[in-house]
Regions:
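Transmembrane alpha-helical segments of multi-pass small-molecule transport proteins
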Residues: 26-32, 103, 128-157, 171-180, ...
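Hydrophobic transmembrane alpha-helices that form the core helical bundles
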Residues: 67-75, 81-88, 92-132, 306-331
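TM-loop-TM module centered on a large, flexible mid-protein loop between adjacent transmembrane helices
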Residues: 83-95, 258-314
Length: 429
């Protein structure tokens, strides 16, 4: 009896210990969330003045952590190990709801994949012509080479995708922090002049209006919902009944890392410029690094900007691919199930990879202007799945009821509603 208890305790201790795979997933979560959008965040978040920026910095961790933890718990609440988000939705809310969420989940993740395919083609094309002084190959060939390169990693499976992302995080964070430190001597007091509750922001809106419209910027800057389902499934297979505790710990470390590195970079950029500079950068619709390179006449920043963007886009593309693949696979499986048919998962993954390769290549070649609008329309869907659906499940699903009664649940719902309302206001104003 004592031997059995001792072995059980030892087994629990080994499962509670931090593993190499935990570090890999922590960096994978970071890699999915922090994409090329971080290069626009100092402008979008800082243009409203210091007060909204400070409030957003305070809200960043709880907003990111509680929302993503809720979605992770939702995926883990399925009866059987190996169930992804689509299957858990169907289990809890029925076939119709499962089909709808699968469709919405795909159309929330997939357009972001298309945006990244266009972005990496534009960035490499610009880098070759401006920094390297080369004539880039025709857009169709260049985009095909880049997308095939990223899809080659996908071909080796989920573990390789997460591993590649975790490796790419190191140079990205390193360069981001070096840039933030490099800007410290340029810090000035101009941004601090906006530290007043009653002054109108540089955008022409009042403080609360500026803060309201800035919430979605923060939500999507730290969003990594497309990889959450794969993360939860992998950790449940690895840790069993201890998966929830382990996932919460990994999420916490990933989000602390996100908030500290990104907000340090944002504050360093904002403090090195004036509010007028930030407004000019927003007007020009260029990344903060492009503006800093021109502003401080620093060619080294001009060189670093596209390199950082390429790394950021690549790792985010890989993370969002997992979400888009899950959504596409879910739609195919549900469609076949309705006809009494099934498909082998490896075969389906190959079909999905081919579909993603062809469509991202076509879109990257054509570079359609409507893509930004499609991505924006996906915003409310992401916010609904990430913020509202898990909180609704806590009230309605017996397996989730143990998480009820926490003030953090109310906080997540409020932030979700604020984000969704602000997105719709921005769309139609």
């Amino acid at each position: 009896m004592e031997t059995t208890q001792t072995s059980t305790i030892a087994s629990k201790d080994s499962r509670s210990a931090w593993r190499k795979t935990d570090t890999m997933w922590m960096l994978g979560l970071y890699g999915t969330a922090i994409g090329a959008g971080v290069l626009f965040l100092p402008i979008n978040a800082g243009v409203g003045g210091m007060i909204p920026l400070i409030i957003m910095a305070i809200l960043a961790f709880p907003m990111t952590f509680f929302a993503h933890r809720g979605l992770t718990r939702f995926v883990l609440s399925g009866k059987n190990p190996g169930e992804d988000l689509n299957e858990v939705v169907e289990e809890h809310f029925g076939f119709g709801a499962g089909k709808l969420i699968t469709l919405l989940y795909f159309f929330a993740s997939y357009p972001i994949l298309l945006v990244y395919s266009v972005a990496i083609t534009n960035t490499v094309e610009s880098f070759m012509s401006h920094q390297l002084g080369m004539t880039p190959p025709p857009r169709a060939i260049l985009s095909l080479i880049l997308i095939v390169g990223m899809m080659t990693i996908v071909r080796f499976g989920e573990q390789m995708i997460v591993k590649a992302m975790s490796i790419l995080v190191f140079p990205f964070v390193g360069v981001l922090m070096l840039l933030a430190l490099y800007l410290i001597p340029q810090w000035n007091g101009a941004a601090l002049e906006t530290l007043s509750l009653d002054t109108a922001s540089a955008t022409g809106n009042g403080l609360w209006m500026t803060l309201w419209l800035a919430i979605p910027v923060m939500v999507f800057s730290f969003n990594h919902s497309p990889i959450i389902s794969s993360f939860a499934v992998a950790k449940r297979e690895e840790y069993g009944d201890m998966a929830e505790q382990k996932c919460s710990k990994i999420l916490a470390f990933a989000h602390i890392m996100m908030v500290l590195t990104v907000m340090f970079f944002v504050f360093s950029c904002v403090l090195s410029l004036t509010p007028a500079d930030l407004a000019a950068a927003k007007e020009q619709n260029i990344s903060i690094l492009s503006y800093l390179a021109n502003h401080f006449n620093a060619p080294v920043i001009a060189w670093m900007a596209p390199i950082i963007a390429i790394i950021a886009i690549t790792k985010s593309f890989l993370g969002h691919y997992l979400g888009a693949r899950e959504g596409f696979n879910g739609m195919v499986i549900k469609s076949l199930r309705g006809k009494g048919k099934s498909i082998e998962i490896n075969k389906l993954n190959r079909i999905t990879a081919l579909f993603m390769l062809v469509t991202t290549w076509i879109v990257a070649t054509l570079n359609p202007s409507i893509l930004g609008m499609i991505e924006t329309l996906g915003g409310p869907i992401i916010a609904m799945i990430l913020f509202l659906m898990p909180m609704y499940a806590i009230q309605k699903v017996p397996a989730m009821r143990k998480y009820s009664g926490h003030i953090s649940n109310v906080f997540v719902v409020v932030m979700g509603l604020i984000a969704i309302s602000a997105i719709f206001y921005s769309l139609f104003s």
